[in-house]
Amino acid sequence: MAAQLLFTDEEVTEFKRRFKNKDTDKSKSITAEELGEFFKSTGKSYTDKQIDKMISDVDTDESGTIDFSEMLMGIAEQMVKWTWKEEHYTKAFDDMDKDGNGSLSPQELREALSASKPPMKRKKIKAIIQKADANKDGKIDREEFMKLIKSC
Protein backbone atom coordinates (compact mmCIF):
# COMPACT_ATOMS: atom_id res chain seq x y z
CA MET A 1 0.00 0.00 0.00
CA ALA A 2 1.58 3.29 -1.17
CA ALA A 3 0.49 5.33 1.87
CA GLN A 4 2.39 2.99 4.20
CA LEU A 5 5.64 4.16 2.63
CA LEU A 6 5.07 7.58 4.22
CA PHE A 7 4.93 6.21 7.76
CA THR A 8 7.24 4.33 10.10
CA ASP A 9 6.30 0.81 11.18
CA GLU A 10 5.49 2.19 14.64
CA GLU A 11 3.12 4.80 13.18
CA VAL A 12 1.33 2.18 11.06
CA THR A 13 0.98 -0.05 14.13
CA GLU A 14 -0.50 2.86 16.11
CA PHE A 15 -2.89 3.74 13.27
CA LYS A 16 -4.02 0.09 13.13
CA ARG A 17 -4.66 0.09 16.88
CA ARG A 18 -6.75 3.25 16.62
CA PHE A 19 -8.59 1.91 13.58
CA LYS A 20 -9.50 -1.29 15.44
CA ASN A 21 -10.77 0.77 18.38
CA LYS A 22 -13.08 2.72 16.06
CA ASP A 23 -14.24 -0.46 14.29
CA THR A 24 -16.59 -1.51 17.10
CA ASP A 25 -18.42 -4.17 15.07
CA LYS A 26 -15.08 -5.71 13.95
CA SER A 27 -16.09 -5.58 10.27
CA LYS A 28 -12.63 -4.29 9.23
CA SER A 29 -14.25 -1.06 8.09
CA ILE A 30 -15.57 2.03 9.84
CA THR A 31 -19.18 3.01 9.27
CA ALA A 32 -20.64 6.50 9.55
CA GLU A 33 -22.21 5.47 12.85
CA GLU A 34 -18.88 4.25 14.26
CA LEU A 35 -17.14 7.41 13.13
CA GLY A 36 -19.85 9.55 14.72
CA GLU A 37 -19.59 7.62 18.00
CA PHE A 38 -15.82 7.98 17.95
CA PHE A 39 -16.06 11.76 17.56
CA LYS A 40 -18.64 11.97 20.35
CA SER A 41 -16.25 10.08 22.63
CA THR A 42 -13.60 12.74 21.97
CA GLY A 43 -16.01 15.57 22.74
CA LYS A 44 -16.49 16.58 19.12
CA SER A 45 -19.81 16.42 17.36
CA TYR A 46 -20.47 16.52 13.66
CA THR A 47 -23.69 16.35 11.71
CA ASP A 48 -24.54 13.21 9.76
CA LYS A 49 -23.89 15.20 6.60
CA GLN A 50 -20.39 16.17 7.78
CA ILE A 51 -19.57 12.57 8.71
CA ASP A 52 -20.86 11.31 5.36
CA LYS A 53 -18.60 13.87 3.65
CA MET A 54 -15.59 12.73 5.69
CA ILE A 55 -16.23 9.15 4.63
CA SER A 56 -16.86 9.96 0.97
CA ASP A 57 -13.64 12.01 0.84
CA VAL A 58 -11.54 8.88 1.53
CA ASP A 59 -13.87 6.04 0.45
CA THR A 60 -12.10 5.14 -2.79
CA ASP A 61 -14.02 1.89 -3.34
CA GLU A 62 -17.36 3.67 -2.75
CA SER A 63 -18.45 1.08 -0.18
CA GLY A 64 -19.89 3.72 2.14
CA THR A 65 -17.34 2.76 4.80
CA ILE A 66 -13.64 3.35 5.41
CA ASP A 67 -11.21 0.43 5.45
CA PHE A 68 -7.72 0.68 6.92
CA SER A 69 -5.95 1.47 3.64
CA GLU A 70 -8.46 4.26 2.91
CA MET A 71 -7.95 5.70 6.38
CA LEU A 72 -4.18 5.59 5.95
CA MET A 73 -4.44 7.31 2.57
CA GLY A 74 -6.67 9.99 4.12
CA ILE A 75 -4.10 10.64 6.83
CA ALA A 76 -1.34 10.85 4.21
CA GLU A 77 -3.37 13.34 2.15
CA GLN A 78 -3.90 15.53 5.21
CA MET A 79 -0.16 15.46 5.91
CA VAL A 80 0.57 16.58 2.35
CA LYS A 81 -1.97 19.41 2.69
CA TRP A 82 -0.37 20.52 5.98
CA THR A 83 3.10 20.41 4.40
CA TRP A 84 1.85 22.69 1.65
CA LYS A 85 0.31 25.04 4.21
CA GLU A 86 3.53 25.08 6.19
CA GLU A 87 5.49 26.00 3.05
CA HIS A 88 2.90 28.70 2.34
CA TYR A 89 3.23 30.11 5.88
CA THR A 90 7.01 29.97 5.68
CA LYS A 91 6.86 32.09 2.53
CA ALA A 92 4.48 34.52 4.26
CA PHE A 93 6.93 34.82 7.16
CA ASP A 94 9.82 35.45 4.76
CA ASP A 95 7.80 38.11 2.94
CA MET A 96 7.06 39.93 6.22
CA ASP A 97 10.67 39.63 7.46
CA LYS A 98 11.85 42.66 5.47
CA ASP A 99 15.36 42.79 6.97
CA GLY A 100 15.83 39.02 6.63
CA ASN A 101 17.05 38.52 10.20
CA GLY A 102 14.78 35.54 10.90
CA SER A 103 12.36 37.34 13.17
CA LEU A 104 9.49 39.78 12.84
CA SER A 105 9.90 43.05 14.67
CA PRO A 106 6.78 44.81 15.93
CA GLN A 107 7.22 47.26 13.04
CA GLU A 108 7.41 44.49 10.40
CA LEU A 109 4.34 42.81 11.85
CA ARG A 110 2.45 46.13 12.02
CA GLU A 111 3.29 46.88 8.38
CA ALA A 112 2.08 43.46 7.24
CA LEU A 113 -1.09 43.40 9.34
CA SER A 114 -1.97 47.05 8.73
CA ALA A 115 -2.04 46.27 5.01
CA SER A 116 -4.85 43.75 5.60
CA LYS A 117 -8.41 44.69 4.75
CA PRO A 118 -9.74 46.01 7.03
CA PRO A 119 -6.50 47.18 8.65
CA MET A 120 -5.76 45.59 12.02
CA LYS A 121 -5.60 48.01 14.94
CA ARG A 122 -2.33 48.57 16.84
CA LYS A 123 -3.83 47.20 20.07
CA LYS A 124 -4.72 43.90 18.37
CA ILE A 125 -1.26 43.67 16.78
CA LYS A 126 0.36 44.23 20.19
CA ALA A 127 -1.82 41.46 21.67
CA ILE A 128 -0.74 39.09 18.89
CA ILE A 129 2.93 39.84 19.57
CA GLN A 130 2.48 39.28 23.30
CA LYS A 131 0.70 35.97 22.68
CA ALA A 132 3.24 34.68 20.16
CA ASP A 133 6.48 35.94 21.70
CA ALA A 134 7.31 32.86 23.81
CA ASN A 135 10.90 33.89 24.58
CA LYS A 136 9.85 37.48 25.40
CA ASP A 137 12.47 39.13 23.19
CA GLY A 138 9.93 41.53 21.69
CA LYS A 139 10.01 39.84 18.28
CA ILE A 140 8.38 36.81 16.68
CA ASP A 141 10.83 34.28 15.28
CA ARG A 142 9.92 31.66 12.66
CA GLU A 143 9.14 28.96 15.26
CA GLU A 144 6.91 31.31 17.27
CA PHE A 145 5.16 32.38 14.06
CA MET A 146 4.45 28.77 13.07
CA LYS A 147 3.09 27.97 16.55
CA LEU A 148 0.86 31.04 16.33
CA ILE A 149 -0.46 30.00 12.91
CA LYS A 150 -1.10 26.41 14.05
CA SER A 151 -3.02 27.68 17.09
CA CYS A 152 -5.46 29.66 14.93
From Swiss-Prot:
Coiled-coil stretches noted in the UniProt entry, renumbered to this chain: none
Gene Ontology molecular function, alphabetical: calcium ion binding
Binding residue positions for Ca(2+) 2: D59, D61, S63, T65, E70
A UniProt-annotated Pfam family: EF-hand_7
Binding site for Ca(2+) 3: D97, D99, N101, S103, E108
Domain of life: Eukaryota
Positions bound to Ca(2+) 4: D133, N135, D137, K139, E144
Annotated stretches, region: Disordered: 95-121
UniProt entry keywords in alphabetical sequence: Calcium, Metal-binding, Repeat
InterPro entries noted in UniProt: CALM/Myosin/TropC-like, EF-hand-dom_pair, EF_Hand_1_Ca_BS, EF_hand_dom
Every EF-hand domain range: 10-45, 46-81, 84-119, 120-152
Summary of the function given for this chain in its UniProt record: Calcium-binding protein involved in larval development and metamorphosis. Likely to function as calcium buffers mediating the transport of calcium from the sea water to the blastocoel where calcium is required for skeleton formation.
Name this protein carries in UniProt: Calcium-binding protein SPEC 1A
